[in-house]
Each structure stands twice: as C-alpha cells, then as structure tokens.
C-alpha cells in the first residue's frame, strides 16, 4: 500500500502484519472502489484501512473515539503525503450520534472495523447515508452477526458474502469480514 504508520507501545495495532495486509487488500477488493468515491472509515484507529483507502478513493473520512489515535492517524496521512483524508474524534459507542458532522455527508462506501463489542450504536445511522457498499471487519463473529441482522432487516442492505481470516493462529479467535450492498 506504500504507507507507513508510527505507533506507541500502548496503541492498538494488528500484530499479525502478514495477515493484516491480506485483510486490508480483501477489504479494498470487496469495497469495489471508484476513484471518485468518498469513503467513511468508522473505528479508524491509526489509519490501518484509511491510508490504503486514500490511495484509491477521492476522499476518506476517518472516525475514531481516541483523540491520540486520531492525532497519529492525521500525522500518518501527512507523512504519507495523503491530502484527501479528514478525521473526527467521536465516541461511536454513544447512543446519540445524530449531531455528528460526518453523518451529514454522503458516502459511496463505508468500512467498519469496530472493537469486540461491535457497532450496535452506529448501525442505525448507516441506512441514512445510503452508501452503495459496506464492508464490516470484526474480531468477534457474534457481534458481526448481530449487526449484520440490523443492516439487512432494518437498514435495507443485502449480505453479499462473509468469511474469516485466521489472524490469531493457535487461538480460538478469528477476524471476520462481510460485505453488504444496496
């Protein structure tokens, strides 16, 4: 992806870099990006997906609850000479997201990579954004399944496919990925 990210010892970052690279590549493939797309990257962290997305899309909006992570994501975008990213600090686990400025924009694509608890609070807002495709990456298939039900049954999306990646060999944990379309 021709991107570099600096991080602190306590920052969250995928430790299995080989599989992380494959996961990011797969997410980009599933999004079917056009060079004119605006993409919303929820739970963006340091920019694991944001930076590669910015190499292929017209604009990427990253949203993350941790101010320090957002500052490092901005610094990474600057260091990688990416000028088509914007970042917002927002607790995506909040019950009331309706006043958030990033929810007032339009997006062709959305990527979510929430923590183990999932994206229950943000899912009800995604239907209003009318994105054509959503890729949901999760470290907990159970919360992905719960949120997929909401996307399909109340937000008007169709599940096109899902799979898992063995991001954590020799453990019971997997990284799951699903793609939805309208």
Feature-to-residue mapping (PLM):
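Rossmann-like S-adenosyl-L-methionine
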Residues: 1-182
